[in-house]
Every structure is written in structure tokens, then in C-alpha cells.
């Protein structure tokens, strides 16, 4: 690991202006990452303007049991997810998603719905054998599965067919920097295979229990007849979300 002062000098010599600010804020909170990793993982969004966007998933992130994984997901939403993710609808054609997932912010609302359906499925006895760690991998995969829906930077429709693989690769690279360890195969594979039978590469279709769980949550949340009033709220209205999100549809009296 680099010493903080040494790292600061080298970052300053290689980057300037806005890029220096974004790199320092996004990747050096503890000044512990190498220059090579910083170059590989330059933020894909406007970091200064989006540092707190993970707040829109506060309730869903709390489903994750591991504090470290919660921190990772917040970091990923704040610093890695491209800007377009926060504004586009979940379906470019408007044919295959419910009304709540259409229009501005639709992809965010869809992602929240996938996380909720995942949590509902995890309450069922057939998933009881999964360890807490593996359940958390499923939760993280649901939250991050569409974060590269049209690429890592600018909106590019041509990248849609492989967006699962692109997202999985970016999550893996970010994981290795964030945790300084290998990325769990089950996590990246669940992201890569979330489209199920529509996954471009047949080798990447759901195989493991977590793969199938994540695909099932995404599939159900994508059905046109689904309507969840709590998620229909404008996600920019944080006060409104705070008021309605705790009333999750599966909570018992």
C-alpha cells in the first residue's frame, strides 16, 4: 500500500482540476489505493453532484446484513454508477415494464422493486438453507444488476444486450479495489445472468440458486401488470419515500 503523502503527490502530478477532485473524493477516502487502480476505476458519474444518491436506496440497502457490503453498495451508487441511471426509464420501448418503471426515474423505481421482491422471496422456506452471506450476495446483485444497462459512461443503446456482463465486470473490479480481495463469483454471476433466458451468452444464464433468485425477482418486477404504490412515488421526494417505504408489502402486523 502507498503511504498517504506519497500517494497524494503522485495523484497531483498525474491528474488535475475536476478529475483530481473526483478521484480524490471517490477513491481515496482513506488514501489507500494504488495509482494503477485509480486509473482503472475513474468514476463513471459526476461524483461531486452525486455523492449522496445512495440515499434513494436507504431502505433497500438496510436489507443487507453485512455492514461492509452496505458500505460497498453505497459507495458504488455514489461514485461508480453512471449519471443516466438516475433519470432513464427501465424499458426503452415501454412494452415490457409496468407503468411505475416508465419515465424519468423509472430504472431507480424498478431497482427498488427488484430488491423488495428479492426480500419477499427470501422469506420463503425453500431459500432458508442459504447462508446470511449468500443472501446478502443476492441482495447486492439485485441492487446493482442494471447499473450498466446502457454502458459504463454515456448512454449507449448498443450495449444493452450485454449489460449484465458489463455490470458484473465493473462490480468485480470495484470490489477488488474496495475490499482488496477477490470478488465472489456468486455475486458477479448473479448480476451477469439476471436476464435469464434472454441473456445473450447461453453460458451466462442462471445456474446457481442465487442466479435463479435474482432472475426471478427481476422478472416479476418487470411484469407490466405489477404496480407498487410506494415505489410509484417520485424518488426525488426523499421525505415522501421516508414516509412510505417502511410500510413494506410483506410486513406482518
What are these regions (language model features)?
Residues 21-22, 26, 33-34, 40:
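Short, positively charged and aromatic/hydrophobic N-terminal segments
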Residues 6, 12-15, 21, 27:
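Aromatic (phenylalanine/tyrosine) cluster motif
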Residues 154-162:
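Post-HEXXH active-site segment of zinc metalloproteases
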Residues 114-117, 161-178:
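An active-site-proximal "capping" alpha-helix that borders the catalytic cofactor pocket
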Residues 129, 138, 178-236:
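Histidine/acidic-rich helix-loop-helix segments that form or flank divalent-metal centers
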Residues 45-155:
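Acidic/His-rich, divalent-metal-binding segments that scaffold phosphate/diphosphate chemistry
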Amino acid at each position: 500500500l502507498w503511504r498517504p503523502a506519497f500517494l497524494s503527490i503522485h495523484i497531483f502530478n498525474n491528474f488535475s482540476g475536476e478529475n483530481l477532485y473526483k478521484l480524490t473524493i471517490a477513491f481515496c477516502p482513506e488514501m489507500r489505493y494504488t495509482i494503477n487502480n485509480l486509473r482503472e476505476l475513474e468514476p463513471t458519474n459526476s461524483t461531486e453532484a452525486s455523492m449522496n444518491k445512495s440515499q434513494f436506496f436507504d431502505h433497500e440497502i438496510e436489507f443487507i446484513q453485512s455492514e461492509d457490503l452496505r458500505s460497498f453498495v453505497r459507495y458504488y451508487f455514489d461514485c461508480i454508477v453512471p449519471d443516466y441511471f438516475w433519470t432513464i426509464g427501465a424499458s426503452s420501448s415501454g412494452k415490457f415494464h409496468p407503468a411505475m418503471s416508465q419515465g424519468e426515474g423509472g430504472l431507480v423505481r424498478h431497482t427498488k422493486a427488484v430488491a423488495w421482491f428479492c426480500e419477499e422471496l427470501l422469506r420463503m422456506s425453500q431459500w432458508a438453507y442459504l447462508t446470511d452471506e449468500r443472501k446478502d450476495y443476492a441482495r447486492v446483485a439485485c441492487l446493482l444488476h442494471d447499473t450498466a444497462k446502457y454502458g459504463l459512461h454515456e448512454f449507449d443503446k448498443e450495449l444493452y444486450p450485454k449489460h449484465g456482463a458489463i455490470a458484473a465486470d465493473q462490480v468485480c473490479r470495484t470490489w477488488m479495489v474496495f475490499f482488496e480481495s477477490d470478488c465472489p463469483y456468486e455475486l458477479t454471476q448473479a448480476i451477469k445472468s439476471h436476464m435469464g433466458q434472454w441473456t445473450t451468452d447461453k453460458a451466462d444464464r442462471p445456474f446457481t440458486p442465487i442466479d435463479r433468485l435474482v432472475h426471478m425477482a427481476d422478472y416479476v418486477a418487470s411484469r407490466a401488470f405489477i404496480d407498487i404504490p410506494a415505489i410509484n412515488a417520485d424518488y426525488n421526494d426523499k421525505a415522501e419515500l421516508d414516509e412510505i417505504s417502511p410500510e413494506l408489502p410483506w410486513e406482518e402486523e
